[in-house]
């Protein structure tokens, strides 16, 4: 082992002394398979899940990378649809180190009308670390919001701004990026949420490689590796980006990565881009093939916001135009965007020629610090949807088979509703 690797492992081991002995987080849960992320369980570990007295052994896939420490993913297969399972992670002596629960997705097609469901979307998560936080500031707070989100019993949670904002000192270190995410999962308030509901990670600037970086910055490989070690997402699409898709009931989710291929270069034939050709082409092809009523496109940067700053997808003007034109040309119905990357929340309604309005739900800080006043001139913002306090979003899909609808709602740290708006599926099918 090289000196460099020895030092990294020593750093991880030292940091682990202040963490709980074992951490778990439910990852991707499908109809017949489920994934559970774990950390701090030693080199010899086993995983089981049970339902109705039947036990399933999990295949263990250990994380790779210098900073991985004792993390990995347990994959449970051969499960039954729409079933509640309890899982446990055990050491080599058989002692249960951590446990939790999950419910597999429904298998309704050709059997029943699509089931109603709701899921959570989270913005910036900031777990305070005084040693590395900006001086004279306490950026994070109201951690009871995790319990408020858990009380809504989401079918799953989407972390649209990552799990924990990186500090300046983290940006040049793979192990620091990894540990920043691990620390966020050690809070007592968050454990009940992440160990009992599925969680999907999104590549987000704040937690991927730092807000001011792009793919041309140093240590992009470290950022990619740390992300992989921290999540139990579905398999990423080919091409290097962290994009993936999954289905739930009559909805399909296309989770994009606007970090790996993000480039701000604007010179000669080069123009700023966030997705890259391969990822953009995959998205368009996948949307065209999808038979789902609702097609949720998830990315860190708001799509509908027209202000061309680096915080918004509008800064990648060419890609935005290509995708917008394609959605009209190919007559893709039911598309809804979900985003974050803002110190406030809002719902945008993008009016476009030839097709129905595109809705973009942008979630503000979950535990990060929100702004007191919104100054950005987003003229597509839905009236009364501005949220300038810590909050989370719940997206509900419900209604009879011939009259489905999606409802966007924001909630505060106590679980109180701040805003709600419902859009009928029929409105998301109109083309000129």
Outline where the language-model segments fall.
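N-terminal compositionally biased, intrinsically disordered segments and leader/signal-like regions
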Residues: 3, 18, 49-51
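Bacterial N-terminal signal peptides
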Residues: 9-17
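Metal-dependent phosphoester/phosphodiester hydrolase catalytic core
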Residues: 22-432
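Bacterial N-terminal signal peptides that target proteins for export
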Residues: 1-8
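General helical structural elements
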Residues: 8-9, 324
């Amino acid at each position: 082992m090289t000196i460099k690797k020895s030092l990294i492992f020593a750093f991880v081991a030292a940091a682990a002394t202040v963490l709980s002995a074992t951490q778990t987080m439910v990852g991707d849960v499908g109809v017949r398979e489920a994934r559970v992320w774990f950390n701090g369980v030693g080199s010899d570990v086993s995983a089981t899940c049970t339902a109705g007295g039947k036990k399933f052994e999990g295949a263990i896939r250990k994380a790779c990378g210098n900073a991985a420490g004792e993390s990995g993913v347990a994959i449970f297969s051969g499960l039954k649809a729409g079933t509640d399972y309890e899982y446990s992670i055990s050491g080599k002596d058989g002692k249960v180190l951590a446990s939790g629960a999950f419910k597999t997705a429904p298998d309704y097609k050709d059997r029943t009308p699509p089931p109603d469901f709701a899921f959570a979307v989270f913005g910036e998560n900031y777990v305070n670390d005084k040693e590395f936080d900006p001086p004279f500031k306490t950026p994070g707070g109201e951690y009871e919001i995790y319990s408020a989100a858990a009380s809504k019993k989401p079918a799953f949670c989407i972390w649209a701004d990552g799990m924990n904002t990186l500090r300046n000192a983290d940006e040049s270190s793979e192990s620091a990026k990894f540990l920043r995410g691990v620390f966020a999962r050690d809070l007592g308030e968050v454990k009940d949420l992440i160990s009992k509901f599925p969680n999907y990670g999104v590549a987000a600037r704040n937690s991927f490689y730092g807000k001011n970086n792009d793919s041309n910055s140093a240590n992009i490989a470290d950022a990619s590796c740390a992300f992989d070690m921290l999540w139990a997402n579905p398999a990423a699409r080919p091409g290097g980006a962290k994009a993936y898709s999954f289905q739930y009931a009559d909805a399909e989710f296309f989770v994009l990565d606007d970090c790996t291929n993000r480039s701000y270069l604007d010179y000669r034939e080069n123009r700023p881009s966030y997705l890259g050709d391969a990822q953009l082409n995959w998205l368009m092809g996948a949307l065209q093939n999808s038979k789902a009523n609702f097609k949720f496109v998830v990315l860190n940067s708001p799509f509908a916001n027209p202000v061309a700053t680096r915080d918004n997808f509008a800064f990648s003007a060419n890609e935005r135009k290509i995708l917008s034109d394609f959605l009209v040309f190919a007559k893709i119905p039911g598309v809804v965007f979900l985003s974050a990357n803002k110190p406030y929340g809002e719902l945008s309604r993008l009016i476009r020629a030839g097709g129905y309005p595109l809705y973009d739900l942008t979630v503000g800080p979950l535990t990060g610090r929100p702004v007191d006043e919104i100054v950005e001139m987003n003229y597509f913002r839905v009236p009364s949807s501005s949220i300038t306090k810590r909050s989370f979003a719940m997206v509900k899909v419900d209604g009879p088979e011939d009259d489905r609808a999606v409802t966007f709602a924001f909630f505060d740290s106590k679980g109180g509703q701040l805003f709600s708006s419902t859009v009928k599926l029929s409105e998301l099918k109109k083309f000129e």
